[in-house]
Amino acid sequence: MSWLRFWGPWPLLTWQLLSLLVKEAQPLVWVKDPLQLTSNPLGPPEPWSSRSSHLPWESPHAPAPPAAPGDFDYLGPSASSQMSALPQEPTENLAPFLKELDSAGELPLGPEPFLAAHQDLNDKRTPEERLPEVVPLLNRDQNQALVQLPRLKWVQTTDLDRAAGHQADEILVPLDSKVSRPTKFVVSPKNLKKDLAERWSLPEIVGIPHQLSKPQRQKQTLPDDYLSMDTLYPGSLPPELRVNADEPPGPPEQVGLSQFHLEPKSQNPETLEDIQSSSLQEEAPAQLLQLPQEVEPSTQQEAPALPPESSMESLAQTPLNHEVTVQPPGEDQAHYNLPKFTVKPADVEVTMTSEPKNETESTQAQQEAPIQPPEEAEPSSTALRTTDPPPEHPEVTLPPSDKGQAQHSHLTEATVQPLDLELSITTEPTTEVKPSPTTEETSAQPPDPGLAITPEPTTEIGHSTALEKTRAPHPDQVQTLHRSLTEVTGPPTKLESSQDSLVQSETAPEEQKASTSTNICELCTCGDETLSCVGLSPKQRLRQVPVPEPDTYNGIFTTLNFQGNYISYLDGNVWKAYSWTEKLILSENYLTELPKDSFEGLLYLQYLDLSCNKIRYIERQTFESLPFLQYINLGCNLITKLSLGTFQAWHGMQFLHNLILNRNPLTTVEDPYLFELPALKYLDMGTTHITLTTLKNILTMTVELEKLILPSHMACCLCQFKNSIEAVCKTVKLHCNTACLTNSIHCPEEASVGNPEGAFMKMLQARKQHMSTQLTIESEAPSDSSGINLSGFGGDQLEIQLTEQLRSLIPNEDVRKFMSHVIRTLKMECSETHVQGSCAKLMLRTGLLMKLLSEQQEAKALNVEWDTDQQKTNYINENMEQNEQKEQKSSELMKEVPGDDYKNKLIFAISVTVILIILIIIFCLIEVNSHKRASEKYKDNPSISGA
């Protein structure tokens, strides 16, 4: 019993809660749905019940606001009676498209009990009775905020196209809209799903500014549920199609808020975009900004523009509702079920102007698309500056073709994210399209500026962005196919070219071929082993070194003269065609620098003229590939400094005799290899700004120099001390002109040059002792010229093998490469009679070069040996001197001590005394023994003693 007392009141409490929940969920009145589907031939239209989420969240007993003109209450009992009944016979054709809306979208707004109750109510219905869901979209300025739809007003409309088999429906208009025209929805009861989902190919524009996205799959046709969508209020889209302005834009699959089923008719003065297509094409991956291609429809279009109605510069206005009405097809056509829908784009700026006429030759059908542009918009304006969509209702009528064919009209579906994108849709008057294969051109603009779509077959694009060209098949092949336009996107800086670029792309290979391989003897003069391209007209002048065709000239070119052309750079690979060239003239061109590989391949070159160009910089070891070079003319350029290694080469430039550097703003010479050129005899540095330090280095280090040309001011300074200089160094002669002798020239170096004890005079004295070559110094003399040589560094297998075989014989890598190349040339190319003379010269020069190099090596070796012997001799001499010095020092020390003689004498005396003592002792012992013997004899014979 205790359990019964505990559970007894529970059903009552539960029933009270459920009753409150039902009262809260039950709407006050059954409001007519914003989209009223009316079947004209089948009977009067019956209202659909709107979900309670469309109503404001307020008390059921709250007083209703007073009726305004155009409101439901204002319309009287006839209007209210239509809102009181539930729908009894929903349209069968729309049921399949509406039954998945409940599962496709989730209602993010409203209380949870009301959502659950209302969802259960809809789930209990049959699939034919299910109601479309309207999900409010989150406001742009408020994240996850509740958005209430405006109050709706109902306007009585006339029946449109009450033909058999068609159905016209009405869409309610918000009360705050300035235009009371309702949205109309005309539905064909047959093949709606098939025609909309499969046959209408909609090229899409997905505006995704400020973000690049690339889909992983191709964009497919929208699901059937979305094609059957009756009302496109902000909340009516499923979550995957909703776009939050605060979130970064996603990939193109996440379609933006608004979808415009509009014919792409646009003419933008800033951007023109042509799309001609008549076949099923795969959609290109989406990029930064996606533009709809120009559709080449098989119908004639007429789009008279209606007068504007209101200003589009406001920042907060009612939604822009596009009203689309579709005419019924002919008797022999398949039924086209074209929906009329209302679109509410967010923060999309649109300008639409009309096109009078488009003519095609494939089919003859007409489409009328009256567009109602915004009021007070400037004629030249391409974008409308609005934050909220304008309160306009452009009405577009798109009747299908009256031909019984499988071709379908091309519609442009513009899907734009609410990110302040400016869309301009204009058209070109009178566009003629032929059924022959066309060129599809698509133009892309940077993000955020106005987007233009222009259906123009031939395009002149003034924008800097370029066009992408493809070929479309013949329209006859499309009659059995569904026309599907490619979704074209592209970063604005990646696409290139317009129609002119097509010509350039076709002619560029020809020009490149002509510039790299051509019959040069038709343009220039060929003969006597000379190629001369001098005196050409400005249009014929060369811009790079030409490469002759193999059979252009029967012989070799030993002299190349390209003087007075427009050559601005040198490619080392081009010289392989002139492997026997000995003289190269490139004066009066537009060279600005000399890279290291500028003359790679001119192995036998002897004469090089680079005068009167615009050379500013010479890379290190530029002349290393010219071992036999005798003459270099670098005059009349813009050289200000000779950097370290300019004349550095493994071969030491043994044959360079003449070097001209005049008429350059040269101030600094940092390359010591210039002063150490072993064979340099003529150096012209006139009209430069060299210093006295450079002159000292030349006089000190350039051993074989015979003639030196100096700037006039420096030469005249030296001429003031002509007698003193020639007296100090007899190997230096000054040739002074009359101007230097008669005119008094200020000489900044006078103090250092005129001082007999100065550095300059000491340098001349050192030159006199070490150099015997007579040096003549002049002022601003004209340059000499001489030269001859040729080239060709190869890299074939034979040369590589020779290099490997010479590794053990020649340790120097540069010399080894040079010798292997010479051997390869003598083996492979010298078999022909017309090059035998050049081969003989090559052998002589190679032998001379090797001789000079070997002499230098021997001289270095002798110097090293002499240095070693000298070091040994010096070491020995130093040691001997050190020993002698030590002995002298010891003897001096002995002499300096006073008791040394006394000690020696004492030692001598002691030794003598000892010897004398020993002798005395021995004598004494002898005497003692003699006396003993005498006494013994006397004792034995006494008679002897008595007698």
Curated annotation (Swiss-Prot):
Glycan attachment sites: 358, 789
Topology term for the membrane: Single-pass type I membrane protein
Localisation: Membrane
Native organism: Homo sapiens
Transmembrane segments: 906-926
Cytoplasmic side: 927-947
Signal sequence segment: 1-27
Broad class of the protein's primary localization: membrane
Topology, Extracellular side: 28-905
Protein name: Leucine-rich repeat-containing protein 37B
Pfam families, sorted: LRR_8, LRRC37, LRRC37AB_C
Taxonomic classification: Eukaryota, Metazoa, Chordata, Craniata, Vertebrata
Stretches assigned to coiled coil: 867-897
GO cellular component: membrane
Region ranges (Disordered): 42-88, 226-257, 294-458, 484-514
SUPFAM superfamilies membership: L domain-like
